């Protein structure tokens, strides 16, 4: 059993958000574990799994909101994976942010990051790493080819 779990308190839209997340990450073994309903019959709590990570969530009302202080980090293997997840998470009113960040329509912040970025940023060649950082700072959705090209000085 997972000892530490992420808990998300949604201001509204919990049921729709959970369904969207499970659908977005379906091919990674995602599912809804359980839901609870309030007196009004609406789903107000949920436990769900995204790519092996268990989340707990409540719909707490308008005095709750998400912030840049925490984000969900997705390590992507390919550009196709970056593109697909970026598109799904930014859909229907989401916002494309800088440096690989996207805010979904419920306000949750996600970092959609290609695995190679860590390799580029931790390069022992600090100039190469610096060029990768400068390229990343100019991007919204991260582009693997663009990051590599910049790191290589092209």
Residue ranges and their predicted role:
Residues 1-5, 67-71:
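Short, solvent-exposed beta-strand edge segments and adjacent coil->beta transition regions
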Residues 8-52:
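Core segments of cupin and vicinal oxygen chelate
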Residues 14, 24, 50, 65, ...:
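Vicinal oxygen chelate
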Residues 40, 63-65:
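Short glycine/serine/proline-enriched coil/turn segments at secondary-structure junctions
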Residues 56-61:
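Conserved, structured core segments of small domains
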Residues 116-118, 126-129:
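Conserved "turn/edge" positions that cap or connect secondary-structure elements
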Residues 129-154:
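Acidic/histidine-enriched, glycine/proline-rich intrinsically disordered or flexible terminal extensions
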């Amino acid at each position: 059993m997972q000892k530490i779990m992420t808990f998300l308190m949604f201001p509204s839209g919990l049921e729709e958000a959970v369904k969207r997340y499970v659908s977005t990450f379906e091919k990674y073994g995602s599912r809804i574990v359980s839901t609870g309903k309030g007196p009004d019959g609406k789903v107000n709590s949920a436990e769900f799994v995204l790519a092996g990570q268990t989340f707990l969530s409540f719909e707490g009302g308008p005095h709750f909101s998400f912030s840049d202080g925490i984000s969900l980090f997705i390590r992507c293997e390919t550009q196709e994976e970056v593109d697909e997840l970026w598109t799904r998470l930014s859909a229907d009113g989401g916002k494309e942010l800088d440096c690989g960040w996207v805010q979904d329509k419920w306000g949750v912040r996600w970092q959609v990051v290609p695995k190679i970025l860590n390799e580029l940023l931790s390069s022992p060649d600090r100039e190469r790493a610096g060029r990768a950082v400068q390229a990343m700072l100019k991007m919204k959705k991260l582009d693997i080819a663009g990051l590599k090209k910049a790191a290589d000085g092209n």
